[in-house]
């Protein structure tokens, strides 16, 4: 199933957003609505009294078939703050370890009354398969599918950019560095940035870690990190997705850090007010140094806190 078909599966017969499966194909208006709702959540703070009953009495399930820290727990917190009952699915302790399919798992939980499924899976096609079998009134949210899509990460990164640089992206110079080929975060970010009218998007990484499927069309692409830094407003550092890549694509971690690691010296070559983002988990000393990750230009922890607010916005938009 292609991405266009998956995009269309997100909408009901009236054209309203029913699921969140990918940012590709979402309108600027829809993206801005979700970001505006998330910004309102930020203004309310970590204890939004007025929203405690938005999902009261509703059961949602975090259905994760891959490890997660930030995404899983921020979705859990988001659903709790909206008053939902949250089930945390552990694949290793479930009947999937006995051969049950993801679709059968979802349908059984749906039969028990779960109305919202937040799903992470290593295979891209599974998200589409689940969307095809859920019943009317049940919502599916993609929390990361293989190396193709991670829509809520894309949204929280856009919110963080708005906070750091304002709502007009047209003059921004953004630089993505690292393993773009295997990064679902990069893909979702690039789709969102194009829809929101980003200025110049630069992409840098080893040739073996750059995609050749048209994703980088319109981007400035180079293998020379140092040459790409001048005037950059935003640096998005991406980890090596070693669980998804073939052996030998990178000679060594030391070699990678020497060529693509963000150090304080390299950051000094970007714009003076440049900000650093990283979706996590961070591999310190590989793609980024401690000094930069913990420094004043790092917005990495803001990304983590924004994750809760964005995921609240998605849940209340689809289920509220």
From Swiss-Prot:
One of its GO terms (biological process) is 'de novo' pyrimidine nucleobase biosynthetic process. Keywords: Pyrimidine biosynthesis, Transferase. Heterododecamer (2C3:3R2) of six catalytic PyrB chains organized as two trimers (C3), and six regulatory PyrI chains organized as three dimers (R2). L-aspartate binds at residues 98, 184, 239. Its EC number is 2.1.3.2. HAMAP family: Asp_carb_tr (MF_00001). It comes from Xylella fastidiosa (strain Temecula1 / ATCC 700964). Belongs to the aspartate/ornithine carbamoyltransferase superfamily. ATCase family. NCBIfam families: asp_carb_tr (TIGR00670), PRK00856.1 (NF002032). It comes from the Bacteria. GO terms for molecular function: amino acid binding; aspartate carbamoyltransferase activity. Pathway: Pyrimidine metabolism; UMP biosynthesis via de novo pathway; (S)-dihydroorotate from bicarbonate: step 2/3. It catalyses: carbamoyl phosphate + L-aspartate = N-carbamoyl-L-aspartate + phosphate + H(+). It is an enzyme of class 2 (transferase). Carbamoyl phosphate binds at residues 70-71, 120, 150, 153, 280-281. One of its GO terms (cellular component) is cytosol. This is Aspartate carbamoyltransferase catalytic subunit. InterPro entries: Asp/Orn_carbamoyltranf_P-bd, Asp/Orn_carbamoylTrfase, Asp/Orn_carbamoylTrfase_sf, Asp_carbamoyltransf, Asp_carbamoyltransf_Asp/Orn-bd. Catalyzes the condensation of carbamoyl phosphate and aspartate to form carbamoyl aspartate and inorganic phosphate, the committed step in the de novo pyrimidine nucleotide biosynthesis pathway.
